From Swiss-Prot:
HAMAP family: SfsA. This is Sugar fermentation stimulation protein homolog. Belongs to the SfsA family. Disulfide bonds: none annotated. Pfam families: SfsA (PF03749), SfsA_N (PF17746). InterPro entries: SfsA, SfsA_C, SfsA_N. GO terms for molecular function: DNA binding.
């Protein structure tokens, strides 16, 4: 996926989860943060950030904050992009005979990101974006997510009902050793992921090639599940 109108700046502060103050060409600007997660390990005063300049006038903010540099690693933190990355990745043929793609498909009490049909296979997919990294390990979630736990339980129910089910973690950066659930932040999510795995939900993790103005799915990353 490509972005346009990218500007480089320095992060100053984050008054709330929706906006941030940044400096661009020596001028302070208010920007929209395209990720309502905590991102405390990323948005540190003085770090280099990448912003997309809006192409229409009637907005409260002129820029969207989409990326940040953390050491030598460039991280895309746009929470709207993982589904788009997954859609593009589908074109590479992981699901053979793919003939139908529908976004936002309801199953019982959940709405999953994708419903696929490939030959005789009927598949639900839930996509999760990952921006949290510690010492080369990708972690999800970065905050407690009861909604995420609910999705995992209902993916398991979909398997029991005869569907295939996947949870796909799109790691929005490169150079990752492995992915693991962040049990320090939300033990229940880690437990639910282990149970989903045991009940037949397939778990995939993909890293991404990230530049200042693009993001594309890269390689599979090892998934490590640890009993709590």
């Amino acid at each position: 996926m490509k972005y346009t109108n990218i500007r480089e700046g320095q992060f100053l502060s984050r008054p709330n989860r929706f906006i941030a103050k940044v400096e661009i060409d020596g001028k302070e600007e208010i920007c929209h943060v395209k990720n309502t997660g905590r991102c405390r390990e990323l948005l540190i005063p003085g770090v280099t950030v990448f912003l997309q300049e809006a192409d229409f006038e009637h907005r409260k903010t002129k820029y969207d904050l989409i990326g940040v540099r953390k050491g030598n690693r460039l991280i895309n933190m746009d929470s709207q992009v993982p589904n788009k990355v997954f859609c593009e990745w589908l074109e590479k043929g992981y699901f053979q005979e793919l003939q139908h793609i529908k976004q936002e498909q309801t199953f019982r009490n959940s709405r999953f990101d994708f419903y696929l049909e490939a030959g005789q296979r009927k598949i639900f997919v839930e996509v999760k974006g990952v921006t949290l990294e510690e010492e080369g390990v990708a972690l999800f979630p970065d905050a407690p997510t009861e909604r995420g736990v609910k999705h995992l339980r209902e993916l398991s129910q979909a398997v029991a009902a005869g569907y295939e089910a996947y949870v796909v973690f799109i790691i929005q950066m490169k150079d990752i050793h492995y992915f693991t659930p962040n049990i320090k932040t939300h033990q229940a999510f880690g437990d639910a992921l282990i149970q989903a795995d045991k009940q037949g939900v397939k778990i995939l993790a993909l890293d991404c090639e990230v530049t200042e103005d693009s993001i594309e799915a890269g390689d599979f990353v090892t998934v490590k599940l640890v009993e709590g």
